[in-house]
From Swiss-Prot:
This protein binds to the 23S rRNA, and is important in its secondary structure. It is located near the subunit interface in the base of the L7/L12 stalk, and near the tRNA binding site of the peptidyltransferase center. Keywords: Ribonucleoprotein, Ribosomal protein, RNA-binding, rRNA-binding. HAMAP family: Ribosomal_uL6_B (MF_01365_B). One of its GO terms (molecular function) is rRNA binding. This is Large ribosomal subunit protein uL6. The lineage of its organism: Bacteria, Bacillati, Bacillota, Bacillota incertae sedis, Caldicellulosiruptorales. Belongs to the universal ribosomal protein uL6 family. The keyword Transmembrane helix does not apply. One of its GO terms (cellular component) is cytosolic large ribosomal subunit. It holds the Pfam family Ribosomal_L6.
Amino acid sequence: MSRIGRKPIDIPSGVDVKIDGNVITVKGPKGTLTREIHPEMIVKIENNQIIVQRPSDERFHKALHGLTRTLIANMVEGVTKGYEKVLEVVGIGYRAQKQGKKLVLNVGYSHPVEIEEPAGITIEVPDQNRIVVKGIDKQQVGNFAANIRKVREPDPYLGKGIKYADEVLRLKEGKAGKGGKK
């Protein structure tokens, strides 16, 4: 991971980075993110770049070095561009709709499943088979999208359920019974 950790992070214009001990705050046009990093990692700002250094070449420090650099880079990208995950609802009669701050999913259960929109995340439903999750925190966006997908994971035989838009499903073959469907 040290190759990733060695790369400096450019600070774009309009982004303000503050380092207070082992707490990093990144302010940008889309919002503010704060993260506590490992106390052994050394983070400096030089020539409008964030530089992450490790105290030694131990395996633990090498792994932390790359992780810390990537987490800070994700914060900078989040406050400038933001993150989004697109999910697709596949299946006859399956649909998603937004009611106020709630996402309502009809995915084959006897009742509609309601999911509350958490703080820092926005949900868009451009049509009844697509859900767009947007936010500035990459981890929060990914976790919330995974929770939506978990409501009805894609069926391995038919592909019905909620899947990521870029996810490729490998469908299993059905039973090879006598004279069955071909």
